[in-house]
Amino acid sequence: GKPVSGVVVTDGAHFKTTDAQGNYVLNTDPARYPMVYISTPAAYELPSKEGVADGFYQYLDAGKSENQCDFVLTKRQKPVDEFVYIAISDPQVRNEKQLDRFRTETVPDLKQTADSLKNFEIVGMGLGDLVWDAMNLYAPYRQAVSNLGMTMFQLMGNHDFNLLYKSMTKTDHPADGYGEQNYYQSFGPANYSFNIGKVHVIAMKDIDYDGNKKYTERFTPEDLDWLRKDLSYVPKGNIVFLNVHAPVANNTVAAGGNARNANALFQLLRPYQVHIFSGHTHFYENQLPAPTIYEHNIGAACGAWWAGHVNRCGAPNGYLVVQVKGDD
């Protein structure tokens, strides 16, 4: 293959871009940053395995003083101008029975939607609470969202942490276990980005986890620092899709579950044309927290926690479909 230069590589804290030979050197601590991963450039296909985003991250061997992680990219035959973006929030499956409803209700519907839009490339984003604290359901969940006719990405919600542990930033000895560990093993990094068409897509966690279901909706200083660096590679004025679990500007739901430090986030996002996609509330709401920032807080795939067929606001269990054309 040919070396690809200018590809952004990160371990979740430090960043480098590949040189003319496609090489990069990153000083990292694998115990604290267990993966290294790329932000796929728009000129290349989104790497996936059986329709689930994969191959853009690699796990580091903490036992080695040096790891070599190479990534293979496939050049697109032509640039993408139009694509479809599907945001799916809160499948929140607690047990086999709920997973079965997701499999038999949500999944066929997603396949049908994808089939009706098959002239376009489709990107899917699971906005967190993929499971309900049930780490054993990650593998069957991944199986359920495979081969839907789209490239399926995920991010972390408050129910996607292993409740026995705190999040990595609050863990003194990660080798003994940490909250994100199971998620990392199943889906890769918590904060990452990729590019498609004219859009820079970011997925982030905005849950600060204390273990045993206790958490605060907020971005840690480390999260915001990662975002600042990621955005430094994106020209000002470009379109950014930011995907998070907890909303940043919800007004409807009492104590809206909003990320506490949304203003720090808005400062970083202001120079861009931003669409934020969030879940968490099981309630549909759109907000314009700043002139260039639009938030789509979407209802849940599980509705009111699989109790029936509707969300708390009465909208049916479902997901959001966005058609993107150029910068529209």
Provide a role label for each language-model segment.
Residues 7-11, 36:
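Hydrophobic beta-strand segments
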Residues 231-252:
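Short acidic, glycine-rich surface-loop motifs adjacent to enzyme active sites
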Residues 1-2, 22, 71:
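A short, amphipathic beta-strand motif
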